[in-house]
Swiss-Prot record:
GO molecular function: RNA binding; structural constituent of ribosome
Any one of the GO BP annotations: translation
Domain of life per record: Archaea
PROSITE patterns: RIBOSOMAL_S9
Organism expressing this protein natively: Thermoplasma volcanium (strain ATCC 51530 / DSM 4299 / JCM 9571 / NBRC 15438 / GSS1)
Protein name, per record: Small ribosomal subunit protein uS9
Pfam (any one): Ribosomal_S9
Gene3D superfamilies tied to this protein: 3.30.230.10
Family: Belongs to the universal ribosomal protein uS9 family.
Keyword terms of this UniProt record: Ribonucleoprotein, Ribosomal protein
GO CC, one annotated term: cytosolic small ribosomal subunit
């Protein structure tokens, strides 16, 4: 298998990961994952690689992510990377490890924002009535 393309979604963010044999370089939108600006999110993105340990050493991952905010993009990237590693290595043991650690590594988190409805400022909030 030359390469594998996988996707991950979170809120309105969609990430597409291309996994192929290489030197263990992970890039997100053209920049190395090690240079991702927010440390908490950087650690979150690199979780699948850290869990896979030696199995992911010779794999290059290129992620393109669009939509959403920084946290949604990080979660989408993380899911795409984990799915890509599992699919590229065809390793069920690794998939089970990911699922036990955190199910959202393999399965998309389908929760989205509740849409705004008429008669108020948000999805649930309504304009006040005075009755006087």
């Amino acid at each position: 298998m030359d390469y594998v393309i996988t996707t991950g979604k979170r809120k309105t963010a969609v990430a597409r990961a291309v996994v192929k044999k290489g030197k263990g370089i992970i890039t997100i939108n053209g920049t190395p994952a090690e240079l991702y600006p927010v440390e908490v999110l950087r650690n979150k993105i690199l979780e699948p690689v850290k869990l896979a340990e030696d199995k992911a050493k010779g794999i290059d991952v290129t992620v393109k992510v669009k939509g959403g905010g920084v946290t949604g993009q990080a979660d989408a990237s993380r899911t795409a990377i984990a799915r890509g590693i599992v699919k590229f290595l065809q390793d069920n043991e690794l998939e089970n490890l990911f699922r036990q650690y955190d199910r959202t590594l393999i399965v998309n988190d389908v929760r989205i924002k509740l849409p705004k409805k008429p008669g108020g400022r948000g999805a649930r909030a309504k304009k006040q009535k005075s009755y006087r």
